[in-house]
A protein has these predicted regions:
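N-terminal leader/targeting and accessory segments in enzymes
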Residues: 1-99
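Phosphate-binding loop of NTP-binding sites
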Residues: 15-16, 96-229, 233-241
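Structural signal for conserved beta-strand scaffold positions within catalytic alpha/beta enzyme cores
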Residues: 24, 51, 76, 89-90, ...
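Structural alpha-beta junctions
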Residues: 71, 241-242
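Generic alpha-helical hydrophobic packing signal
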Residues: 73-79, 86-88, 213, 224, ...
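Residue immediately C-terminal to the conserved phosphorylatable aspartate in receiver
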Residues: 78, 169, 249
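Active-site loop signature of alpha/beta-hydrolase-fold enzymes
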Residues: 81, 197, 251
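Single conserved hydrophobic/aromatic residue that forms the stacking wall/gate
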Residues: 243-256
Length: 256
């Protein structure tokens, strides 16, 4: 399939992945979208538009406009009267977007490198990407699109020609890394360090360690974890109970 299209994201699969109800012309169910965005200004021909309710603006108000711009299908939290195109009715567009990102990632034959840590995530992402680009077609997080909104949008940017995705993941509270790793399912997970960020939610560095290591819950089979052994907290991760894995592991210390 051409990189113009998002592999396996047909209207039917979008509805299934989002656990929503497809409403529209059923002859279009096998139509594959060409992109997915939350910003109505970025909509192009064949795109999926995902309206998000923000603090000041509800993206649903732009649904009529995006169909005029060429959107193929939209998500919606409420039924649309006289819709100009097909849509998938869901309880929460934000949650549906995350489910769709997880489905899309798993449908792709690609290796994913996940990167987290209190500091150094972006620099590490750029260095790893630079090395991998010498041999592979790499898709990487743009800017700091590393949260529960930015990560799915980054995943939606992956195309079939990409061989590796380098995804930055940032959190501020417990449970967030669990949700991010559910979407990204890393084959390699890098933790740069455990610092003092977001202690108002995580309590102390032990809390930061616990929150960051949620990333191991949804790694792919035979995945590899790369931890900074010079970090005193990460150096304590020597039993799998700390990294949410139930079977024995092999730990190897690499120095240079």
């Amino acid at each position: 399939m051409s990189d113009k299209y998002m592999k396996n994201l047909t209207f039917a699969n979008i509805a299934k992945a989002c656990e929503g109800t497809y409403i529209g012309d059923e002859t279009l169910l096998d139509t594959t979208i060409t992109g997915a965005v939350i910003d109505s200004r970025q909509v192009k021909e064949g795109y999926l538009f995902i309206p998000i309710k923000g603090e000041r603006v509800d993206g649903h108000k732009f649904i009529p406009t995006v169909f005029e711009q060429g959107a193929a299908i939209v998500l919606s939290e409420h039924e649309l009267t006289d819709s100009a195109g097909p849509y998938v009715l869901v309880e929460s567009t934000t949650d549906a977007m995350k489910k769709l990102a997880a489905f899309y990632r798993k449908s792709l034959d690609i290796k994913v490198v996940g990167i987290t840590g209190s500091v150094g995530k972006t620099s590490t992402k750029e260095m790893i990407s630079s090395v991998l680009e010498q041999k592979y077609s790499v898709h990487k997080t743009a800017g700091n699109f590393n949260n529960e909104i930015g990560l799915p949008l980054t995943i939606f940017g992956i195309r079939e020609s990409h061989q590796v995705a380098v995804l930055e993941m940032g959190i501020s509270d417990f449970g967030e890394m669990h949700r991010l790793s559910t979407m990204s399912c890393p084959d390699v997970m890098v933790i740069t360090n455990i610092g003092y960020c977001h202690l108002e939610f995580l309590g102390d560095r032990d809390g930061v360690l616990k929150a960051k290591t949620e990333c191991f819950e949804h790694m792919m089979p035979d995945a590899v974890a790369v931890l900074n052994a010079d970090d005193d907290k990460l150096a304590t991760v020597q039993t799998l109970s700390l990294i949410h894995i139930s079977e024995p592991t092999r730990l190897r210390r690499i120095s240079y």
